[in-house]
């Protein structure tokens, strides 16, 4: 589903990429960074919780040295306890959902983040979670959530021309006629795309946990 939404956005963005959209707009000088950390409710072996927790903690310390404020949303009992113990109060925290995430939590996170970014409370938003590569291997993923870049709305490492898109396996390019304009359609699709990215991270982390 996430891939399908991304392909749809690739078609729309190819017709009209409007950098003034709230989720695409850059804020200039970076003053506030928000991390969305997805880990586990359980104390799992290895670095499942420790790896992303320490990464976010070190990044927050590095930003503080540069005079940049930072905060974190914690998804999972362990990261919530980790930062609370270190006197860092999460901007939001979710406990008891790591094994069975649902769209309600994803919507709450996405709405909070999108509203905060649009109002200028955050200048950059970073997502950190585990990707279930296969049954025995997981990969820690760190990616920028906001601002959404032009590259994120295209197929990975591929140009976005109609000719190039038509050659990508599983991607069919159609020369759409937009009503309303592609810029307006893009503005309507971006929030749905953003919610999908959040929910995908919660599901991916749950799969990696198991």
Labelled PLM ranges:
Residues 1-210:
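C-terminal beta-strand-loop-alpha-helix "lid" module of Rossmann-like NAD(P)-dependent dehydrogenases
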């Amino acid at each position: 589903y996430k891939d399908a939404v991304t392909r749809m956005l690739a078609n729309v963005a190819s017709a009209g990429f409007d950098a003034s959209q709230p989720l695409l707009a850059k804020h200039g000088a970076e003053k506030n960074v928000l991390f969305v950390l997805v880990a586990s409710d359980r104390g799992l072996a290895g670095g499942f919780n420790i790896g992303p927790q320490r990464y976010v903690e070190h990044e927050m310390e590095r930003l503080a040295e540069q005079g940049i404020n930072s905060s974190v949303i914690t998804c999972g009992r362990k990261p919530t306890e980790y930062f609370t113990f270190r006197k860092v109060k999460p901007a939001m925290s979710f406990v008891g959902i790591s094994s069975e995430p649902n769209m309600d939590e994803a919507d709450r996170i996405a709405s909070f983040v999108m509203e905060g970014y649009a109002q200028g409370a955050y200048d950059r938003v970073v997502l950190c979670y585990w990707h279930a590569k296969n049954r025995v291997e997981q990969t820690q993923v760190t990616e920028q959530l906001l601002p959404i870049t032009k590259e994120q709305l295209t197929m990975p490492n591929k140009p976005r021309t109609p000719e190039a898109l038509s050659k990508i396996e599983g991607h069919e390019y159609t020369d759409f006629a937009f009503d309303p304009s592609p810029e307006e359609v893009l503005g309507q699709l971006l929030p749905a795309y953003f919610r999908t990215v959040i929910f995908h991270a919660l599901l991916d982390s749950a799969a990696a946990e198991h």
